[in-house]
Amino acid sequence: MAYCLTNCYQYSVTFEDTAVDFTQEEWILLDPVQRNLYRDVMLENYENVAKVGFQLFKPSVISWLEEEELRTLQQGVLQDWAIKHQTSVSALQQEFWKIQTSNGIQMDLVTFDSVAVEFTQEEWTLLDPAQRNLYSDVMLENYKNLSSVGYQLFKPSLISWLEEEEELSTLPRVLQEWKMCLKTKGPALWQDNFCLKTLNGIQLARNQNGEELYDCKQCEDVFCKHPCLKTNMSTQNRGNTSECIQYAKDLLSLYNKTSTIRKVSVFSKHGKSFRLILNVQVQRKCTQDKSFEGTDYGKAFIYQSYLEAHRKTQSGEKLNEWKQCGEAFTHSTSHAVNVETHIIKNPYECKECGKDFRYPTHLNNHMQTHIGIKPYKCKHCGKTFTVPSGFLEHVRTHTGEKPYGCKECGKAFGTSAGLIEHIRCHAREKTFKCDHCGKAFISYPSLFGHLRVHNGEKPYEHKEYGKAFGTSSGVIEDRRSNTGQKRFDCDQCGKVFVSFSSLFAHLRTHTGEKPFKCYKCGKPFTSSACLRIHMRTHTEERLYQCKKCGKAFTKCSYLTKHLRTHAGEKPYECMKCGKAFTERSYLTKHLRRHSGEKPYECKKCGKAFTERSDLTKHLRRHTGDKPYEYKDCGKAFVVSSSLVDHLRTHTGYKPYKCNACEKAYSRSCVLTQHLKTHAAEKTSECNACGNSFRNSMCFHDRLKTLTKIKPYKCKDCGKAFTCHSDLTNHVRIHTGEKPYKCKECGKAFRTSSGRIQHLRTHMGEKPFECDQCGKAFASFSARIAHLKTH
């Protein structure tokens, strides 16, 4: 199991495999519709990959897209707030310079620290909600009083934290994130414009859009404020900055209490300006510092958490399990994403139906289903869609594009979700087991749908006709069959299908294409379902066992049919003759005998058959195809049963035994003919000579000899024969073919009887004995020649 899990993670799909990156110039050229389409697809891909545990950390492009999404939705509100904030900052700056330059008089200012009361973390937890609210009101009022008279220019960290605590209960999440971003931007602009100090280790510049760019001097990477700013703390001015760095760390720990992600933060103390490192990944990337190394694997990592995650993937360890769904994860990040899908309510809720969503664009797409707007239309079939991702997946059904390929087996898929489900098949993570039959499934929805087979639940009802179904697809197919909605026609035979996938699978019967190949024996199949059933013959995987006789089967339907033999149940009865059958297919074939229907007709000779298998066997006679070949002697057969009978001639296995004389045979039909000799059954009688025959074949051969009818004629010499087998043996004289070869000496023969007589010379067997002198012979013809001497 550990090996399967390790192999699964080795070929895991990451977000980078499915992501498409644009440069700044390319992004500017995209119109709003194209940007929305790109954002929806990227966010959906990231959500699918993160949900199954293949993406541990949020990529920078996703963070940036989320910010772009929030900026677009709240642009009007944020612009008003930014203007108000900039006005207040300008007023504070003017008041500050008035105090500094008024008559050169230096005044002793009252600061917030002199009137503030601070609590430790332990003391804060002991306060009840009323005491916390009172404390917040007093501290905020003191800060407003000092700010109004200009005695407090910079906002203390305590006030920022209290404001966040207050706003989290009243303001939406979107405004909260962007308000904090603007709060940090205000002091940063004041530092850059008035103090004119250079940021440590960072060169400040602006691009053509007015966005701030930061150039790291160690690795020469350039960063902007979106999607994520990661900078290095300078080590050049270590002498007098230890206290400031400690101050910055304290502020950072305080900010982490309220938000796990902060893009940019600038703090000032003692006249120094610093850019906090919210993510030290770039710093270690620049210095190539990989302090954590796995001794068993020889791999080095930047963080201890990375090493622990890698160790779990190698050992297959899964410590993070959610009891509600039963899924276990190697990484806590994947576990957190799974828990969030179960217990955390998404912030964007639909007012019509109450459904909630994680992203606002998903809510907008959902609202279109209520108002009936489907802006994305397929040019091929005219089908419309509400979301671009569904439209792109549908287009791939027309183009045949499958961009998501499995690295292990090479199978391709049109969606990333399909690839993720397929990768689970390689890992064989079937943790959800059915208590009734023991069948295991990869996901809980698959198990939930399977349980409906046992309990008979049919939640999907067709209101017009009153029919109920276990799946939603059953309702759709029934509606199409009743309304006549069948749009997919086969150009070759004219057959109509309700879906493109059904038509695509049907076309393989015309083209003979078998894309699903067994990697063990090389046998091809037209569908993946047939291949899965075939693979069980190699692995001997028989999951469904009969409790009465112990016989096991590869499919649940086979077990169900087998159980009817124990119970004697025959639910399918013929209304005309009363005969009952265990399977519906047997009844369908039986009814064709009453009606004389033969739906399967040969296009070459016009012969019709009641069963498709009979037509398939008949077509092989036209094409000469003999797919069942025995490798030892090279003989091939049209049907598999003939190959099985032929194998018994090599092995000597004779399962059909006569109870009267204990003589055994390799074929049941030969035993049936032998039993007629004991019963003295001679049903066919010749009117010309008066002889009786046990079967019709011998009777017809006798008639041919009397009437001298020889319908089988040789094309080379013109010689005619009464039997087709005699013509086949005669043709080998012209062709020189000798298919029957002796394994002992290598001698070859034209007929099987010739080889059998030859084998008796090796074994010393002489079954033909003379009645007069008792001498035995290996062949019947030798005995006849000997009788002439007497």
From Swiss-Prot:
The keyword Transcription belongs to this UniProt entry's keyword annotation: yes
Positions of C2H2-type zinc fingers: 284-314, 348-370, 376-398, 404-426, 432-454, 488-510, 516-538, 544-566, 572-594, 600-622, 628-650, 656-678, 712-734, 740-762, 768-790
Keywords: DNA-binding, Metal-binding, Nucleus, Repeat, Transcription, Transcription regulation, Zinc, Zinc-finger
Primary location group: nucleus
Compartments where located: Nucleus
CDD domains documented for this protein: KRAB_A-box (cd07765)
BP-aspect Gene Ontology terms: regulation of transcription by RNA polymerase II
Gene3D superfamilies: 6.10.140.140, Classic Zinc Finger (3.30.160.60)
Gene Ontology cellular component annotations, sorted alphabetically: nucleus
Molecular function in Gene Ontology: DNA-binding transcription factor activity, RNA polymerase II-specific; RNA polymerase II transcription regulatory region sequence-specific DNA binding; zinc ion binding
SUPFAM superfamilies, per the entry: beta-beta-alpha zinc fingers (SSF57667), KRAB domain (Kruppel-associated box) (SSF109640)
Domain KRAB: start-end pairs: 13-84, 110-181
Function: May be involved in transcriptional regulation.
Family: Belongs to the krueppel C2H2-type zinc-finger protein family.
Official protein name in the record: Zinc finger protein 560
